[in-house]
Regions:
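Predominantly soluble domains enriched in secretory-pathway, periplasmic, or organellar proteins
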Residues: 1-314
């Protein structure tokens, strides 16, 4: 089967999910979505995208928001189905574990929902409290047994056990307004970015004991572990990327982005390059060896989450 490398992304203010040819920037498809979709996750076969219907413009806007996860067929470029999250609303953080289970985080109700067979059942099989207030993002161990939730109003990160509700959430501090988070590849370390304190905190992924910090630029919103074993912070306020040694927490490099950086994605077959969504409605490509950043292609309004996939030719 012939495939083309494709960047798929949410266009938050365009209320859509689109795919772009990675080399030409040509739009391959656009799927209309309800107002203000935000985060998404890709299934194990890398053929379905699950998009959370947040339903309000930003975390600072009032409203109940949406109560669904929309499945998008990435090969056909069309809607595939809907997972019903009601009565839980403002679906933001989205994750998928190694077994294909979908995890959806309700920011309004501070609940983590689990869809154990999303292709067969469109309602949650499990729901567990996040242990925080205004729970915004989450990251997941590969087996789905541990979830880490950052909450904007309780200013906490919590360790949640989605498949054992008898275990209460374990909370820790990681600075005010923690948001971006990621696990080390061996899942022993958790990294959390504080938007208000401009800092990364490293925590033991089992105990949440702090083991190091690093200062970032203004307003770090996302963290990524790169193929070259660097921790990358996206600084929304500073309009920059900063690179850190994840073991020593030493800063290694800075890349100014011009526009505000929103999301980063690595190429599965080309570990030397990453693609960066920017708030000027564009995607840039970053050479991870030279740290040169250049324009790649224009997008719809406010690109958000981003992934690089080999999708079948139409």
């Amino acid at each position: 089967m012939d495939t083309r490398w494709t960047a798929v992304l949410v266009e938050k203010f365009g209320h859509s999910f689109s795919g772009y040819d990675l080399h030409t920037g040509t739009r391959r498809f656009t799927v209309a979505l309800p107002e203000y979709p935000h985060e998404f996750a890709i299934d194990r076969d890398r053929l379905l995208g699950y998009v959370g219907h947040y339903g309000v413009q930003t975390f600072a806007h009032p409203g109940d928001g949406g109560a669904a996860v929309i499945a998008v067929d990435l090969a056909r470029g069309q809607r595939h189905g809907v997972l019903d999250c009601a009565p839980w609303h403002r679906i933001h953080g989205l994750q998928i574990d190694a077994q294909g289970r979908v995890y959806a985080l309700s920011e309004r109700d501070n609940m983590l929902l689990v869809f154990e067979a999303p292709s067969a059942r469109q309602t949650p099989d499990r729901a567990v409290p996040s242990g925080g207030v205004k729970s915004h993002l989450c990251v997941l161990s590969r087996d789905g047994r541990r979830a880490y939730v950052t909450s904007l109003l309780s200013h906490t990160v919590t360790l949640v056990h989605p498949h054992d509700a008898t275990r209460p959430p374990l909370a820790a501090r990681a600075g005010r307004r923690p948001e971006g988070c990621c696990l080390s590849p061996d899942e022993s370390l958790l990294y959390v970015a504080s938007r208000d304190e401009h800092r990364i905190t490293r925590l033991d992924a089992h105990t949440l004991a702090e083991s190091g910090t690093a200062e970032t630029g203004e307003d770090p919103t996302r963290l990524y572990w790169s193929p070259c074993n660097r921790l990358i912070a996206l600084n929304y306020g500073e309009r920059s990327l900063r690179f850190f040694d994840p073991y020593t927490m030493a800063e290694l490099a800075r890349v100014d982005t011009g526009a505000k950086p929103i999301a980063l994605a690595f190429h599965p077959a080309d570990p030397g390059h990453a693609w960066l969504a920017l708030n000027d409605d564009s995607v840039g490509v970053l050479d991870l060896r030279t740290l040169a950043l250049r324009h790649a292609f224009a997008t719809g309004k406010e690109p958000d989450g981003l992934a690089i996939l080999a999708l079948p030719q139409p």
